[in-house]
């Protein structure tokens, strides 16, 4: 995946910069997401890998996308096709979303708990995390039955282990040292 990321990064950055300049961040996010879904389709993916002519590849790909892409996005796809980079569109879309979240000062936080969190708990958690991380928070909550109690919060490289098991482990470590 790192090679795909390396190849996709300049394209994602170019698309993001253009969308920012045009004031069309949402529109480009939708178009890239759609084009990425098309590129991931098994039939299209096999066609992209077997097609030898750039013109035919571009024509078919844009034909499948139809009116979902505006002229600028179509030109973007043509550049990708000319450089034989259409298969990296999903990575371009993902990196674009990352750049957009960074620009919007937004972070997706994964929260694992033993039971489903109530709306009030989610709201309180969002407020506390926004204060601590100084960013807009988007929660992605999941239930993990192996957690006896408490929460595991993952935000990028930051992990906050507030589970009972984590607290017991820290207590045991403190007693041993």
From Swiss-Prot:
Keywords: ATP synthesis, Cell inner membrane, Cell membrane, CF(1), Hydrogen ion transport, Ion transport, Membrane, Transport. GO terms for cellular component: plasma membrane; proton-transporting ATP synthase complex. InterPro entries: ATP_synth_OSCP/delta_N_sf, ATPase_OSCP/d_CS, ATPase_OSCP/dsu. It is a peripheral membrane protein. The keyword Transmembrane does not apply. It is found in: Cell inner membrane. Disulfide bonds: none annotated. One of its GO terms (molecular function) is proton-transporting ATP synthase activity, rotational mechanism. The keyword Cell membrane applies. It comes from the Bacteria. Belongs to the ATPase delta chain family. F(1)F(0) ATP synthase produces ATP from ADP in the presence of a proton or sodium gradient. F-type ATPases consist of two structural domains, F(1) containing the extramembraneous catalytic core and F(0) containing the membrane proton channel, linked together by a central stalk and a peripheral stalk. During catalysis, ATP synthesis in the catalytic domain of F(1) is coupled via a rotary mechanism of the central stalk subunits to proton translocation. This protein is part of the stalk that links CF(0) to CF(1). It either transmits conformational changes from CF(0) to CF(1) or is implicated in proton conduction. NCBIfam families: ATP_synt_delta, PRK05758.2-2, PRK05758.2-5. F-type ATPases have 2 components, F(1) - the catalytic core - and F(0) - the membrane proton channel. F(1) has five subunits: alpha(3), beta(3), gamma(1), delta(1), epsilon(1). F(0) has three main subunits: a(1), b(2) and c(10-14). The alpha and beta chains form an alternating ring which encloses part of the gamma chain. F(1) is attached to F(0) by a central stalk formed by the gamma and epsilon chains, while a peripheral stalk is formed by the delta and b chains. This is ATP synthase subunit delta.
